[in-house]
Each structure stands twice: as C-alpha cells, then as structure tokens.
Amino acid sequence: MKAERQTGLRNSFTTVIGRKLINTFVPSMMLTSVAGNDIFFRGLFKSPVLAFQSYRYVSILGQLKPSDGSTKSFKRLGRGPSSGLGKTSGRGQKGQKARGKVKSWFEGGQTPIYKLFPKIGFTNVGAKPLKELNLKRIQWFHDKNRLHLQPGEVLDMNKMRKLGLVTGPIKYGVKILASGKFHYNLPIALEASRASAKAIAAIEKAGGKFTARYYTPLGLRAHLNPQWFLEKRGRVPLQARPTKRRDIDFYSKEEKRGYLVMEKDKLLQDIKEAQNKGSRHFLKQNVKKSSLEIELEELSPEKDWVPVVSNSKVMNIKALDH
C-alpha cells in the first residue's frame, strides 16, 4: 500500500472529517505519512481539513458551468432549406410578423440595463479646474528654508511655480486650500485665482493677506512666463478685466477677497455708478477720436448745440385742402 502511494500519480484515500466519509484524489507526492485518520501534507498545510478543502475547490474548477436554463444555443437562420429555418427564417410569408425586427437593446421584457444602471450627473463643459495648493505645503517649504521671499514680496502664482510649490501645467489658475491650517503661521501676502473660506481665515489669522485675482488664459500665460512674450513678441500683453457677469460678481465680493473690491478697481466703481443710474444709462467707452471729429466738436460745442425738433404728424386729405 505504501509503495502504491509513493509511485502512483493519483491515489484514493479515505478519511473521517466531521463524521463524514469523503473520497478524493490527491497526488501521491504530497502524502508523507498516514497515522490513523490524520494526513499531513509536505510543506503546504498543517491541518488535513485545510488540505482537503483546498483540493476540493481545485476539483470543482474543472466542473464549472452556467446554471440550467441561463443560456441557450444560437439559432442559425437563412442557411438552407434542410435546417428548417432557411428562406423565410421561420417567419412565414408576408404579414406584420414577417417584417420588422426587434431593437438591439430590447432584453425580452426584463428591466433593461440602461434602467438598472442609469447615468447620473453630467460633465460641466464650462468647468475650469484649478491647481490645488494646501497651506501645509507652503508651511513645509518655509520650514525647509525653500520659501525664498523678500520682505513685503507677494507670493503669487509666478513665484509659486518658480519655487516648486505648484508643479505641472497651470491652465486656469491656482486655488489655496486649508489643509494644515492649524499649523500655518506665516504672515505673508498671497495671491491666487481663488481660496477657500477656511484658508482665507487661516491666512489672515497668521497676519497675512490674500487677494483673488482674475486671469484670462492669455493673461495667465503672460503672468507665468513673461520672458517668453518679451523674446517672441517684444511686449507683454496687458491683463484683461473680467467681462462675464459671474466673474465680475465673484471678484467683487469681499468675502472672496476679490481684487476688484480689495483694490477699489475703477471697473467696479463704474459698474456701481451705472447700476445706480439705472438700466437706461450705459457706460460710455473711451474711443479715440479722429482729428476731424475733434475739429467738429470745437466748431460746434455741445453746449451751443440745439437738437432739431421734428414736426412730423399724420395728415389727411381735408387738412391738405385747407
């Protein structure tokens, strides 16, 4: 019996586990000794129960199959008369049932997948994802003596990029977040596109100042890399002012620390003046006048100009006779 266990590829053995008689096959090379009902496996399992369960699962892997009735064979249509589903494919001749087809997404009446797992939410095509910078990273740079700022210098996005505080492409701007606010103690001025309310509170608590500044994509490129514009264009483009209502509203809020209200920008003053006058009064744009227009204004100043009064009215034939 021992010789058969040593030489045979697969042997049958019987053991009692949990008062059940189980017959299984195990490679003979795994068997080392049989003492009563205890079977020990070389280098793999200390317990015969674990060994049996492992080989039980292995034996099941070769017998996996779909549940009964869950699948069916494909019906080959239009493949000759001998199949019984040739010419008309089992639909007969003419009529509503012989024509048309089932939609590709129809699932036989069961709840379709597009109702089981519907698409939720949407992609905001107007979103402008900002680079995130936490206060703990600024504090860490200062502790490592890597935050090289002159007295009174503002830590703006250009400086953040040079120091390595923000890495990678900056497409729309930088937003300051409040992670590490309890350990932040730098009394410096920061300037970025936006900042969270908790970050603003932590910066001002440490004695610093934050300003949210608006940049267009071109203005941001000029701010981050002005040397490129000087070399390629010979000039640096001027920073544009916000034109969209939501941008003007954001950068004119004091709780957001927008630069329009923090620096008392003339644009905000003009907007408030126009709002006070009403919707009929609009801002007058400063347009460069030609020399001819200037001469005409000098010859006929606005104070001496009298508007032409129109005497037009509706007339009839009787009025014309008189």
UniProtKB/Swiss-Prot annotation:
Entry's Gene Ontology cellular component terms: mitochondrial inner membrane; mitochondrial large ribosomal subunit; mitochondrion
Compositional bias of kind Gly residues: 81-93
Family of this protein: Belongs to the universal ribosomal protein uL15 family.
Residue range of the transit peptide in the UniProt record, numbered on this chain: 1-57
The protein's name: Large ribosomal subunit protein uL15m
Pfam families: Ribosomal_L27A
GO biological process: mitochondrial translation
Positions of region (Disordered): 69-99
InterPro entries on file: Ribosomal_uL15, Ribosomal_uL15/eL18, Ribosomal_uL15/eL18_sf, Ribosomal_uL15_bac-type
Additional record remark: Present with 5350 molecules/cell in log phase SD medium.
Gene (UniProt): MRPL10
Keyword Ribosomal protein in record: yes
